[in-house]
Every structure is written in C-alpha cells, then in structure tokens.
C-alpha cells in the first residue's frame, strides 16, 4: 500500500490519489498544487480548466525568479503568474482519479475539499546538448511526484447574530468627554 504524508483525523472520509515520476516541471506543479489547496473539488476543477484556457492564472509565490507579471495575478494579491498548462492537466487527471475513488468509497462528491497536495521532486533525467568547440552540456528534466487527498467536509452552518462590540475610543476623546461632562 502506498504511503502518504497526510494523516487524516477520520480516514473513512478521505480519498487519495497519487502519481510518481510525472514528466512535468516540479516548480510549476508545486505552485499549481499550492493554488488549489483548500478549494472544493468542483471549484478546483473549473479553476484548473480556466488556467488551461488562459482565463485565470496560477500565482507564483515561491519559485518566482524570472516569472513575468500578469494582470490576472492581482486577484491573488501578487504580481507574478503563469499558465502552466501541462501541470494543470496532470492535476486535473489526479482530481478525476480521486473523485472516482471517492465515489467508490461512497463519499459525497459535492462536499469534497482538497485537503492535502504534496509535490516532490523526482530523480532528474539526463540528456545532453552539444555546444561550440566540441563541448557537451547537461540537458536535465525535473520530473515530480504528486499526491493529493480530498476530504469530505460538513456543510458550514452560518452563525447566529453576534453582538457588536462597543467601538474603542482613544484616550484623547475620553479626556475630552470628561471635560465636557464636568462642565
């Protein structure tokens, strides 16, 4: 049985999917995983399909060196973003796999949330490129392992009326009120 990094509180309400040695860039995929973590399943799938169609972008926060700016990243309070098509397609495949695992386990698909996404760098694959003066340089690829866990969450019940706290006044205003009260 495959070992996962995620230890759920209730294993009966979790479904998992995992893929190893995917030939897709590690850095792009880790940013994609970070973007969909915490989303509902249907929202994550529509978001990733929008990224493939260039309607929304993936915000780049950690691996952002040399990444260009785009206006769509403003929605995520950052300036840098990209549209990693291949990473999104691999994530969509894993989400589809996890969804079918959830149906098999009898979980409610409408209440599934992406609880855990882990992207790890796999062993690099080596090729070569030929340079001037008879030199040879490495031409490496950066594949990755992806694991994904969906958790069935309860419906959120809205809270009742909350009493609004009295607005805090500054010391200057309080002093002024005391002066007015004395007169």
Swiss-Prot record:
Residues 163-183 are annotated as: Disordered. GO terms for cellular component: cytosolic large ribosomal subunit. InterPro entries: Ribosomal_uL22 (IPR001063), Ribosomal_uL22_CS (IPR018260), Ribosomal_uL22_euk/arc (IPR005721), Ribosomal_uL22_sf (IPR036394). Keywords: Ribonucleoprotein, Ribosomal protein. Disulfide bonds: none annotated. GO terms for biological process: cytoplasmic translation. GO terms for molecular function: structural constituent of ribosome. SUPFAM superfamilies: Ribosomal protein L22. CDD domains: Ribosomal_L22. Residues 165-183 have a biased composition (Basic residues). It holds the Pfam family Ribosomal_L22. The keyword Ribosomal protein applies. Belongs to the universal ribosomal protein uL22 family. This is Large ribosomal subunit protein uL22. It comes from Pectinaria gouldii.
């Amino acid at each position: 049985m495959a070992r996962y990094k995620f230890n759920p509180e209730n294993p009966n309400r979790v479904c998992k999917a995992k893929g190893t040695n995917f030939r897709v860039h590690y850095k792009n995929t880790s940013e994609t995983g970070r973007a969909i973590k915490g989303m509902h399943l249907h929202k994550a799938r529509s978001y990733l399909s929008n990224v493939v169609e260039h309607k929304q972008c993936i915000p780049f926060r950690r691996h952002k060196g040399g990444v260009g700016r785009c206006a769509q990243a403003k929605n995520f309070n950052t300036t840098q973003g990209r549209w990693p098509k291949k990473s999104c397609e691999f994530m969509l495949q894993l989400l589809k796999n996890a969804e079918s695992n959830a149906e098999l386990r009898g979980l409610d698909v409408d209440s599934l949330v992406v609880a855990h996404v882990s992207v790890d760098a796999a062993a690099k694959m080596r090729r070569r490129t030929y340079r001037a003066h008879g030199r040879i340089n490495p031409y490496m690829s950066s594949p990755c392992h992806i694991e994904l866990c969906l958790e069935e969450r309860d419906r959120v019940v809205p809270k009742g009326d909350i009493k609004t706290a009295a607005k805090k006044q500054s010391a200057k205003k309080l002093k002024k009120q005391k002066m007015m009260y004395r007169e």
